[in-house]
Amino acid sequence: MKPFAAAFTASMMCCTSALADVPSLAVDANIVFLGEVHDNPNHHETQADWIAALQPAALVFEMIAPDVASGLSAADRADSETLGKALGWAGSGWPDFAMYAPLFSSAPNARIYGAAVPRSMARQILSDGLSVAMTLEDRQRFGLERDLPAAQQAAREAHQMAAHCDALPEDLMPGMVLIQRVRDAWLAQQALAALQDTGGPVVVITGNGHARRDWGAPAAIAQADTTVAVYALGQSEDGAAQSGAFDHVVDAPAAERPDPCAAFK
């Protein structure tokens, strides 16, 4: 087990010039989104470097439920093994916690917030509507009460179909897009709450799709509060164009992974 204090010290020793490598717009932002391809360790190394440089007052994670994050104690964050167990990471379905642990240790004093939409709630949204996820006030605040423009709805449905290897029925796509919009709104809600609670800056750890400025959580924040300065970093693989609008995109080698569509064949 590696104490987080030692990990933080090592991180700062290796990254004393890291702030110079972070764009000034990110340094000055209230909320910084750090996108990722979830299983790419290179992307998590970049995130850890940016977090070490920015030293945010709060970290918001797509992967953690709000109640789990709020229940973390200082003892839970004593080392990576203890933290992983406190988060219930092993049974969460997310990639190896070893890739995510440095994100916590790079800012050991940051408050942790969670924005994960429970799977049970996602299913309930499809059957019972958005009221199970947010109040009417918040749905209006983050734009969930408005239909998307037709072109954006079609693009989002195509994106979801491609992400699922063109293997799912088309009539499921509108519901999947709706769930993604709810996840964007939850990320935005938690990021704004973290900013209000701590004064910022706030760093949000999430997939590239939720970090994009044009229709991800940054767009939901812009709907809610135009005075909040947001910066969005996307991360690509092997030089491939990254879908969506970002303030900056960092490229890295692709992670070694099996064919994600093999299960559908």
Regions found by a protein language model. Give the residues of each.
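Short internal beta-strands
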Residues: L59-A65, Y231-Q235
